Amino acid sequence: MSFLAAGMVGLQGLGTFMKYSSLKREGQYAMGAAQFDASQAMFAGAQEIINGETRANDRIAQFDSDMESNIALFAFKGRDVDSDASINAFFDKQKNIAYTDTSLMANDGYIKLGQAKLRAKQAMYRGATAKASADYRATSAIINGAFGMAQTWSTFG
C-alpha cells in the first residue's frame, strides 16, 4: 500500500471517529438538557403548589379580617351578632364562599403540578429520542466510515 493510500485511510478513520464522537456527545447533551428541562418543570410545579397554598392562606386571612369588620359594623348598628339569624346566615355564607375559594386555589396548584409533571415527562421523552437518534447516526457514521476506508484501501492499496 502506498503512503498516499495509508494517509487517506488514516484521515478517513480519523474523520469517522470524530463524527462518531461528536454524535455521541450530541446525544449526551440532548439528554442532559432534557433532564434540566424536566427538573425545571418539576420545580415550577412545586412552586405552584406553594403559590396555591399561599393564595388560600391569604384568602382565609382576608375572610377573618372581613368577619371582624362585619361584626364591628353590625354591633355598631345595634344588632346582636350572636342571636340574629340573618346575620349568622350571612356569616355562614361568607365562610362557605371563602373556604370554597381556598379549595379551588389549592386544587389549581395541584392541577398545575400535574401539568408540570407531564412537561417533565415530555422533556425526558424528547431527550431520550434525541439521544437514540444520535446513537443511530453515530453507528451509521462508523459503518459509512468503514465502507469508505475499505473502498480507499481497495482502490489505492
Regions found by a protein language model. Give the residues of each.
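Glycine-/small-residue-biased sites that favor an extended, beta-strand-like backbone
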Residues: 7-157
